[in-house]
């Protein structure tokens, strides 16, 4: 079976919980006990599926299999250092999130990122001694030529997200990359689970895109993603298309803290009971669980990372459910 029987709509949770809505995201690439619900914040400034909806008319997704021939030129390579890219277009996604398209130096260039990897942004505020650095995972395909797309949530008092939101087409931002994350290859795991909060969906999206655009990759994916309101759900159209196209291989479960009256999904918080119901069991062979979200969510679900290169110990709900260190990756 694809997974244990899953219940799409759960009853609203009644127990009190500690809220994480306004907790800023961890600055890295991308709950107190088992019965505490976790409110998922609707954003993570970080640490990528296809480009089913782009700006304006829409853009054809990059080819699923690279054509034979010379490797395309890469805009970003670590040895190049920071590269200034010009903002080409901006789309307002919701009240605090924008989608931004940056032109690569040449039309036939690709970004240079791979799956899974992120990039680093840099700018120096006026009067500051040091520049601000923040990682983001693009949502455009790694094979896409000519541009890269970011989804960025604006945080109150967040210097980088505020700066990016204030950019207008024609202005530039410095980028460096790729920042390696989890090295993905086709069929590396037969079943992966993804737990995301807000824009923590971006590194998950990057891996999902690689899986489902590759005909040779048969990996199954279970996604649990939490947000505050329905308008905060990012890439929902693409995720719905995936469910319709691959019903035996992809399932998405949405959790809203403040759902509309007609909401048919899960209401409230991501809980131990929900994850126990929908995720692959820890005893399944060679599974992987990816987690990406704000610090409060990470602490409650899996435990936080110690640093970009140190995953830290596994704790929280996933440990209580029996998942081991080597089964979990934190973005």
UniProtKB/Swiss-Prot annotation:
- What cofactor does this one take? FAD
Q: Which GO terms describe its molecular function?
A: cytochrome-b5 reductase activity, acting on NAD(P)H
> Where does the record say this protein resides?
Mitochondrion outer membrane
The EC designation for this entry is: 1.6.2.2
CDD domains per record = cyt_b5_reduct_like (cd06183)
Entries under PROSITE patterns matching the protein: FAD_FR
Q: What InterPro entries does UniProt report for this protein, alphabetically? A: CBR-like, Cbr1-like_FAD-bd_dom, FAD-bd_FR_type, Flavoprot_Pyr_Nucl_cyt_Rdtase, FNR_nucleotide-bd, OxRdtase_FAD/NAD-bd, Riboflavin_synthase-like_b-brl
List the GO terms this entry assigns under cellular component, sorted alphabetically: mitochondrial outer membrane
**Residues the record lists as binding FAD:** 188-223
- How does it sit in the bilayer? Single-pass membrane protein
Which terms under GO biological process does the entry name? ergosterol biosynthetic process
Reactions performed catalytically = 2 Fe(III)-[cytochrome b5] + NADH = 2 Fe(II)-[cytochrome b5] + NAD(+) + H(+)
Say where the protein is mainly found: mitochondrion
The UniProt similarity line reads:
Belongs to the flavoprotein pyridine nucleotide cytochrome reductase family.
What task does this protein carry out? May mediate the reduction of outer membrane cytochrome b5.
- Identify this protein by name: NADH-cytochrome b5 reductase 2
Origin species: Pyricularia oryzae (strain 70-15 / ATCC MYA-4617 / FGSC 8958)
Protein encoded by which gene = MCR1
């Amino acid at each position: 079976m694809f997974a244990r029987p899953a219940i799409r709509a759960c009853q609203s949770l009644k127990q009190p919980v500690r809220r994480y809505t306004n907790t800023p995201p961890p600055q890295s690439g991308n709950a107190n006990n088992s019965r505490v619900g976790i409110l998922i914040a609707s954003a993570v400034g970080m640490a990528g599926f296809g480009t089913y909806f782009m700006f304006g008319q829409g853009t054809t997704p990059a080819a699923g299999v690279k054509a034979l021939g010379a490797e395309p030129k890469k805009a970003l390579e670590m040895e190049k250092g920071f590269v200034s890219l010009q903002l080409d277009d901006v789309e307002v996604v919701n009240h605090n999130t924008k989608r931004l398209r940056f032109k690569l130096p040449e039309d036939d260039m690709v970004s240079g990122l791979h799956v899974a990897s992120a990039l680093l942004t840099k700018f120096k505020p006026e009067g500051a001694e040091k520049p601000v650095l923040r990682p983001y995972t693009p949502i455009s395909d790694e094979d896409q030529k000519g541009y890269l797309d970011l989804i960025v949530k604006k945080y109150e008092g967040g210097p980088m997200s505020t700066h990016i939101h204030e950019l207008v087409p024609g202005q530039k931002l410095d980028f460096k990359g790729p920042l390696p994350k989890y090295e993905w290859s086709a069929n590396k795991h037969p079943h992966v689970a993804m737990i995301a909060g807000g824009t923590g969906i971006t590194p998950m999206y990057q891996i999902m895109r690689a899986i489902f655009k590759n005909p040779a990759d048969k990996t199954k994916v279970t996604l649990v993603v939490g947000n505050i309101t329905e308008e905060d759900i990012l890439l929902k159209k693409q995720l719905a298309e995936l469910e319709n196209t691959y019903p035996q291989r992809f399932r998405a479960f949405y959790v809203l803290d403040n759902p509309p009256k007609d909401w048919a999904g899960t209401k409230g918080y991501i809980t131990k009971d929900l994850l126990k119901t929908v995720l692959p069991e820890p005893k399944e062979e060679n599974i992987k669980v990816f987690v990406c979200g704000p610090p409060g969510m990470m602490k409650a679900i899996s435990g936080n990372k110690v640093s970009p290169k140190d995953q830290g110990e596994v704790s929280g709900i996933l440990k209580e459910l029996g998942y081991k260190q080597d089964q979990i990756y934190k973005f």
